[in-house]
Amino acid sequence: MQQTSRYQTARRILIFWTLFIGIGAVGGALMMLLDPSGKTMGMDGMLPYFQVLPFAEVVFQDLTFSGWALLIVNGLTNLTAAALMLARKPAGTVLGGIFGVTLMLWICIQFYMFPLNFMSTIFFIFGVCQAAAGYAAWVFRKQEAFTVNRADYPHIGDDPTRLVVFFSRMGYVRKKAYEEADRTGAAVYEIRAAERTEGTLGFWWCGRYGMHKWDMPIRPVDIELSAYRHVTICSPIWVFALAAPVRSFCKAAAGQIREADYILVHHQKDTYENAAEEMDRLLGVTHTSLRSIQCREGTYKETSKRKEMIV
């Protein structure tokens, strides 16, 4: 089933926020510039509060400076970001998120100037929503741009005595599994979960399994593991522990694997030796090596590498 693009969803939400904030800021700025006294729209009552700001006797005797500042800081900026996103320019999502932070900083000045009020509070929340949408769009774009093509690894399967087993939601573990199989000539076997793991709902569902350290149902293991001299198991880390589908695989494979090493892929800068020790217990083996790799949106950094041991 074709998955809905999370990037496009976040991008549309961010376009809404940039247009909403941008158009509102332009409207407010025009009211200030057309009537700097603020009397027409009842904004003259705000001027006494501006006197706590630096250079108030010069720039805050009327609303002219405030109008220009609002137009530039929250109006034109957000409309520019919206235009870039409508033109499908990646810079638009980055700027849209940044301008959400700008709005929050703007409102922080209002918190300093004015008594606690509904408008300042709600627009601060709007800024949080805009910044969050911008960050989500940036992350989802990088995730969806990440691809792994098996055809790029021509030596997979050259050595019939080795096997690489992996589970991967986003493709990050798959890439490392293919690289290892291409390096050693191993065949590959993918663990497939019987639960939903794709997309945002899949992320939260997997997090539930990870938090409780439950086993996740997987498709039957239809490969003769004992036929391989050496098996490499590649696993993501879920909530600081072994991924649930890999845990289920290890239980199903107990006593069938003669020799194993592990590759762990995760977001944090850690080694996660606890996951390797858990796989050892479940499989009834002692791993010959462990590689622990930090991955953030497709950028890898090895956090530990153990040389193979003779056992």
How does the language model describe each region?
Residues K89, N117, E198-T200, K305-R306:
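Intrinsic-disorder/low-complexity, polar/charged segments
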Residues A29-L30, P36, A186-G199:
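Early exported N-terminus immediately downstream of N-terminal targeting peptides
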Residues M43-Y49, F55, A194-K213:
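N-terminal beta-loop-helix "entrance" segment that forms/cooperates
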Residues Q2-I156, K251-A252, R281:
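Topology signature of small-to-medium multi-pass alpha-helical membrane proteins
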Residues C129-L163, S168-R192, W205-V311:
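FMN-binding flavodoxin-like domain, especially the glycine-rich phosphate-binding loop
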